[in-house]
Amino acid sequence: MVDSLTLQPVALVNGTVNLPGSKSVSNRALLLAALAEGTTTLTNLLDSDDVRHMLNALQALGVSYQLSDDRTTCKVDGVGGPLVASKPLELFLGNAGTAMRPLAAALCLGSNDVVLTGEPRMKERPIGHLVDALRQGGAQIDYLEQTDYPPLRLRGGFRGGDVTVDGSVSSQFLTALLMTAPLAEQDTHIHIKGELVSKPYIDITLHLMRTFGVEVSHDNYRVFHINGRQTYRSPGDYLVEGDASSASYFLAAAAIKGGTVRVTGIGKKSVQGDTKFADVLEKMGARITWGDDYIECSRGELRGIDMDMNHIPDAAMTIATAALFAEGPTTIRNIYNWRVKETDRLAAMATELRKVGAEVDEGEDYIHVVPPAKLKFADIGTYNDHRMAMCFSLVALSDTPVTILDPKCTAKTFPDYFEQLARISQLA
């Protein structure tokens, strides 16, 4: 019997949500803190599955840290160089792409013998473009099951030099190379093949590397230059900003059924590109106010939009369900990389939107949504994908309830999401 949660129709949303730490920032910061010289105290760390997988891996690799009882403050003792496994190891990383990709690169420094593996879905998430680039730099990597996919056996050997990486599937491959390159013996020049997707996520990586004392130069995101033989240095304390992708659900809820909702922990100074989601809501007709460490959204008459959302792929999913409440159709374009996330998000989104009555055209890299006159009650499959569960909670902002199957899958980034949503919701 699969777990389910039925959300009753909501009349109004109003209030403030303090966001959990960003997943993208948390796992990058943990890895850099481990590689750095000195001790780093990370605050507002995300407590979630993905971060737990990174912490477990670092511990197995001999990194010592102290985690607070609420798991949101972590004091990491850096090793001041590459991570070295004292014996052959197998690390299980669940379905955490933000742990798998950066660790796959970092463990190619020196001479390790480490296997990285994960859940069945992880073995369907491509990593070939990263492996190709690491091999160009001298890394010894074997595929243990299917070519181009985890599990991987890593035996060190990455020295740097000239490498080319395909940027068209995931920016995490470039992120992994960037974070590893400063510790290589030689300087590294990373050439990007194809169109670089999700560029703002690269800015998060460069910001964090700078925070830990390493500068990267690039020629308009086409070629990146990183000096070798560097050392990351702990900044001492680092505050992880709130998760901008997680903010999207609350901001969209306010746009549909506000009141006014304020999310704190992100704002106009945020390093995350997903804060641009607020601009999309504004284009659709919502009212947005920006503070240094908050974004506020109030209800407006929403209109459908047609937009390239390659720069905000995770938050763009929220637009697909917000579109159910807009006047006219919505088209979200250039989102092929939805297909290689926690699930094939394009197929999943199309299937579930049709269940609630929308007319949907699913293309190779776009989705076109025509909202129904009235939403239908449905059981929503979540595909073990945290974002599917959170996106479809918005259906309850109508006069129709919605049932979310396996609601606990939000644990990947936001374990108490449904409690937070209930806290700002007034039932019809």
Swiss-Prot record:
The keyword Transferase applies. Keywords: Amino-acid biosynthesis, Aromatic amino acid biosynthesis, Cytoplasm, Transferase. 3-phosphoshikimate binds at K23, S24, R28, S170, S171, Q172, S198, D314, N337, K341. It is an enzyme of class 2 (transferase). CDD domains: EPSP_synthase. InterPro entries: Enolpyruvate_Tfrase_dom, Enolpyruvate_Tfrase_sf, EPSP_synthase, EPSP_synthase_CS, RNA3'P_cycl/enolpyr_Trfase_a/b. One of its GO terms (cellular component) is cytoplasm. Belongs to the EPSP synthase family. This is 3-phosphoshikimate 1-carboxyvinyltransferase. It comes from Serratia proteamaculans (strain 568). The lineage of its organism: Bacteria, Pseudomonadati, Pseudomonadota, Gammaproteobacteria, Enterobacterales.
